[in-house]
């Protein structure tokens, strides 16, 4: 191999390294963007989990109040089931649909 061939091979190798370096820089930039997005999503997820915990603590109280209101209406002689909602119960007869709604767990 003469000096010119050696120089050309070294020049080609240098160009290949520059192209590879550019590709590595592009991958590095893309990775940085993905990591930043991942961090942002983790923070948002943590905030949403905290908020969900707060909402779950509030929900049983609201549900209990709503169910108590429905029971009061039922004991006042009205249907609270979806089929007959608001209609008066004849002779205060039991309604299995209302009972299921009021006493389900």
UniProtKB/Swiss-Prot annotation:
What GO biological process term is on the record, naming one? Answer: DNA replication
Job description of the protein: Involved in control of chromosome replication initiation. Inhibits the cooperative binding of DnaA to the oriC region, thus negatively regulating initiation of chromosome replication. Inhibits the ability of DnaA-ATP to form a helix on DNA; does not disassemble preformed DnaA-DNA helices. Decreases the residence time of DnaA on the chromosome at its binding sites (oriC, replication forks and promoter-binding sites). Tethers DnaA to the replication machinery via the DNA polymerase beta sliding clamp subunit (dnaN).
| Protein's UniProt keywords contain Metal-binding | yes
Organism the protein comes from: Streptococcus sanguinis (strain SK36)
Q: What is the name listed in the Swiss-Prot or TrEMBL entry for this protein?
A: Replication initiation control protein YabA
Which keywords does the record carry? Cytoplasm, DNA replication, DNA replication inhibitor, Metal-binding, Zinc
Where does the UniProt annotation locate this protein? Cytoplasm, Nucleoid
Spell out the GO cellular component terms annotated for this protein, sorted alphabetically and separated by semicolons. nucleoid
Assembly and partners are described as:
Homotetramer. Interacts with both DnaA and DnaN, acting as a bridge between these two proteins.
The transmembrane residues are none
Q: Which family does it belong to?
A: Belongs to the YabA family.
The signal sequence is none
Q: Which InterPro entries match?
A: YabA
Q: Tell me the cofactor note.
A: Binds 1 zinc ion per subunit.
Locate the residues binding Zn(2+): 79, 81, 95, 98
Task: Specify the domain of life of the species encoding this protein.
Answer: Bacteria
Cofactors that this protein relies on: Zn(2+)
UniProt keyword Lyase, yes or no: no
Q: Which Pfam families does the entry mention?
A: YabA
């Amino acid at each position: 191999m003469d000096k010119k061939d050696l120089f050309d091979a070294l020049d080609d190798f240098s160009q290949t390294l520059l192209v590879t370096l550019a590709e590595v820089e592009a991958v590095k930039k893309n990775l940085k963007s993905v990591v930043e997005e991942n961090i942002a999503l983790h923070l948002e997820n943590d905030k949403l989990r905290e908020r969900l915990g707060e909402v779950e603590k509030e929900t049983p109280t609201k549900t209990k109040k709503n169910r108590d209101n429905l029971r009061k209406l039922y004991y006042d002689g009205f249907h609270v089931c979806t089929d007959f909602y608001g209609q008066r119960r004849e002779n205060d007869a039991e309604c299995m649909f209302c009972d299921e709604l009021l006493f389900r767990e």
